[in-house]
Amino acid sequence: MKATPPIPDSAPVVRLGQVLDLNAAGPLANELLAVRGRNVDVDASAVERLGAQCLQVLLSARRTWDADGAEFSVVSPSSEFTSTLALLGAPIDQHFNSRELSA
């Protein structure tokens, strides 16, 4: 029988890059898939540009986490991240759990 590794107390943190464009969408999806099934914190503090493709990845991931019964939180969102979400019709307070990242 294979031993199940212990689940860490803290959620893994996926740190978003400064530019989330078409080129970043595939790697972002892969990084999120690597932590699927666990609660996850997505650190959006460094985001300067957010494209529709990466927004689509994030929205899909959030829905997947909801379906899996896991928590998907955007933490420390930059003002650029938040304003672009609103501009693209996906205000952060309507589509994501959001909070500041604990030190």
What are these regions (language model features)?
Residues M1-Q53, V57-A103:
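STAS-like cytosolic regulatory interaction modules
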